């Protein structure tokens, strides 16, 4: 679990703008790599 969180944080920092825009509007528009993790993480948190 720690590994996933670390990877998610790193990806989010690397593509903050890329993941922030599509994730807010359409989570399906983003790529199935870092965005997918972001959506999954956000869904779990919310």
Curated annotation (Swiss-Prot):
Function: Lanthionine-containing peptide antibiotic (lantibiotic) active on certain Gram-positive bacteria. The bactericidal activity of lantibiotics is based on depolarization of energized bacterial cytoplasmic membranes, initiated by the formation of aqueous transmembrane pores.
GO biological process, one term: defense response to bacterium
Domain of life: Bacteria
Gene for this chain: srtA
Protein name: Lantibiotic streptin
A GO MF label: signaling receptor binding
Record InterPro entries: Lantibiotic_typ-A_Bacillales
Record flagged with keyword Glycoprotein: no
Modifications after synthesis and translation: Maturation of lantibiotics involves the enzymatic conversion of Thr, and Ser into dehydrated AA and the formation of thioether bonds with cysteine. This is followed by membrane translocation and cleavage of the modified precursor.
Similarity field: Belongs to the type A lantibiotic family.
Keywords, in A-Z order: Antibiotic, Antimicrobial, Bacteriocin, Lantibiotic
Cellular component terms (Gene Ontology): extracellular region
Additional notes on this entry: A longer form (streptin 2, with three more amino acids at the N-terminus) is probably due to incomplete processing. Other forms also exist, some of which are due to differing levels of dehydration.
Induction: Induces its own expression in at least strain M25.
